[in-house]
Amino acid sequence: MYTVIGASGHVGSIVATELLNKGLSVQAILRNPTKAAQWQEKGAKVALADLLNYDSLATALKDTDTLFVMTPPAFHLEDPIGEHLKMLDNIAAAVQQSSIRKIVYLSSIGGHLRNGTGAILKLYDMEQKLRLLDIPTVGIRAGWFMENFGESIKQAASEGFFYSFINPADLKLPMVAAKDIGHLASLLMQQELQGHRMIELSGPDVYSAEDVASVLSTLFEKQISVKVIPSEQYQSTYRQFGLTDAAAKLMAEMNEGFNNGHIRFENKEGIEQIYGETTLAENMSFTIEKEHMNFRAK
């Protein structure tokens, strides 16, 4: 059985759906019981489990053969790094008590770095933990999610501009669509794996916040501009979004790491480089259509 941790997220839902479309036996691990019915209707088995609760996780993974792991951002926790380490301990222990033969997991650009990455440190910890398992694993270090601009699109549609943490606005970053991440993960889960592999995944090009504004200007048929958020306002901005102080601090450090060039792909021998097919324009157009936004937004 193919089990997907994080099936309700952008990437996890794509992974589970693609596996189901192949006629494979899929289990979606969820925290929210209200989302169970939609997966059951698609033909998936559903298990309710909390990554901070070993017993529920071990029960859910008992009959799993192949596992996809994507951990939650933990923005609501007072100690995101410490609590995430507990999640990783539970995952590793549950895997060792199961019949799991291989794992595909989602890491991030910068996942090889121990310092200066803020929230990405959680994924460094994940890489280190899962590499200790005596079964094959493959990690996907994904670039900046194009979906991170979801709220920016809404703001641009209504106000004609959006705020960006990317500073300067013309800074080019490796970006990738969740669609391409999920597709790669589903393919890897169906392969025979050996050892501990690492893949660095980006889109067909690098993009900036100014590129986002240009794409949205074309799609909305009006001028869209970008306003850069000063770094000294990062933490307060994230706290306004509802993050805990600790989570806001981590996100601020992460953004500064991107902006100063510290967070990057490792790009060394032995690490596979793969490029997704979805362009920024295609991703933005899809998001607008999905949200039923008016292309001629005022």
Where are the predicted features?
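Short glycine-centered helix-capping/turn motifs at secondary-structure transition points
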Residues: 160, 261-265
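Aromatic "clamp/platform" in nucleotide-sugar-dependent glycosyltransferases that forms part
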Residues: 83-88
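Short, conserved active-site loop motifs that form the nucleotide-linked donor/cofactor pocket
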Residues: 43-44, 137
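Amphipathic terminal alpha-helices
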Residues: 266-298
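Terminal hydrophobic/aromatic helix or amphipathic segment near a protein terminus
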Residues: 216-261, 297
